[in-house]
């Protein structure tokens, strides 16, 4: 089954990776880059070049909030830290409005030392992303130290998630793009009605 987006979609679909690891050039960042590329490629011609934002470098930059608001797909990545996501990521998420991820498909990525820490971190992260209005249509990309050591190539480590869930991400993005288009059209009509009075 193909996971490429329908050609009927003409809107440019924004894919953004958000890395909450304070360490530069981390494995978490490499996994994020790969997942962003997978989603972008699966969206076909409508998928724009996915950007990666490392919050350690840009967390205080207001343009990051704007980019998050514009994204159709947000890949949110964190290493497990004491059974939860990092304080760096929390600080950024706290700056978003209560519905700051509404009409955004969110793919969490968790890297952890053990399966227990991975599960706890994933639960905490998915909860807060859902509270912010994000759509979480598929399971997270969860990788342990053992997963990453057993497969030198990140593509191999993410392969199982890709095969099982990438099509679900694409379908959800199509629904979000349609919803955004409908909302924008309704807002434009309402604005036109107001200005014509």
Predicted regions and their residues:
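Short, glycine-/small-residue-rich phosphate/pyrophosphate-handling segment
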Residues: 106-154, 160
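N-terminal beta1-alpha1-beta2 submodule of the flavodoxin-like/Rossmannoid cofactor-binding fold
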Residues: 1-98, 163, 170-173, 177, ...
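Short, amphipathic alpha-helical "lid/cap" segments that border enzyme active or binding sites
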Residues: 154-170
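Residue-level preference for alpha-helix termini and adjacent loops
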Residues: 80, 84, 100, 140-142, ...
């Amino acid at each position: 089954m193909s996971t490429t987006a329908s050609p009927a979609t003409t809107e440019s679909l924004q894919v953004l990776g958000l890395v909450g690891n304070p360490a530069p050039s981390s494995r978490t960042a490499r996994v994020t880059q790969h997942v962003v590329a997978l989603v972008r490629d699966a969206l076909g011609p409508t998928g724009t070049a996915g950007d990666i934002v490392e919050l350690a470098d840009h967390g205080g930059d207001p343009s990051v909030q704007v980019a998050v608001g514009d994204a159709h797909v947000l890949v949110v990545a964190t290493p497990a830290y004491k059974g939860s996501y990092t304080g760096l990521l929390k600080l950024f998420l706290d700056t978003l409005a209560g519905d700051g991820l509404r009409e955004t498909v969110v793919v969490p990525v968790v890297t952890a030392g053990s399966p227990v820490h991975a599960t706890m971190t994933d639960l905490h992260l998915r909860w807060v992303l859902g509270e912010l209005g994000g759509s979480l249509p598929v399971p997270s990309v969860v990788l342990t130290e053992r997963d990453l050591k057993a497969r030198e190539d990140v593509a191999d480590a993410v392969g199982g998630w890709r095969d099982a869930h990438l099509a679900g991400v694409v379908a959800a993005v199509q629904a979000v793009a349609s919803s955004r288009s409908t909302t924008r059209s309704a807002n434009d009509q309402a604005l036109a009605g107001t200005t014509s009075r």
